[in-house]
C-alpha cells in the first residue's frame, strides 16, 4: 500500500493519470475513488480527455439505467476505469490493476447507513485479493494512514512542491465583527 502525501496543487491528479495509463497498458482495469459526487464531473472530464470512452462514472446520483450500464461495461471489460464515490469500490472489475483513493482522509468514505462499511478497508481487501497496488492520496491524510506510513506499513510518497513551483494562494483573515 502507498500513501501519496502532496501539497495542494502538487500534481496528484497527474500522478493518478500516469499510473492508470501504465495499468491500462498492462491490460488491467482501475478504480479511482473521490470523496463527493460534486467532484466527479471535473475529474471525469480530465480522465475522459485522456482515456475517452474507457471511463465510467459510478455514484448514487445516477439513474438505474446509467448505473447498470456502468456496471456492465466494467464487468465485460469495455470500460477500463471506474471513477466514483465510495460505492465505486464495489465496481465489478475482472482484472483490477490499481485502486486509487483521492482525499483519503475524508469521512465520506465511511458509510453510516446499512450496510455499514469503510471504502478504504474494502479497497485494501480488494487490492489484497487482486495482488495490485492501493494508492491513498491526500494533502491532509488521515492520522491512521500517516501513522501506517511512518511505521512502514504503507510506503510514504511525498510531493512537497506545487506543480511548476507555483506559489500557494495568499490568504487574508478578516474580522467581520
Residue ranges and their predicted role:
Residues 55-64, 106-117, 177:
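Flexible beta-alpha connector loops of hexameric P-loop NTPases
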Residues 85-86, 102-104:
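Walker B catalytic acidic pair
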Residues 24-25, 75, 127-128:
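Conserved ATPase "switch" residues in P-loop NTPase domains
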Residues 1-6, 31-33:
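Short hydrophobic/aromatic beta-strand immediately N-terminal to the Walker A/P-loop
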Residues 46-54, 58-82, 93-96:
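Conserved motor-coupling elements within RecA-like helicase/translocase cores
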Residues 10-15, 22-49, 66:
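Conserved Walker A/P-loop ATP-binding site and its immediately adjacent core
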Residues 9, 13, 98, 105-172:
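Post-DEXD/H (motif II) to motif III coupling segment of the RecA-like Helicase ATP-binding lobe
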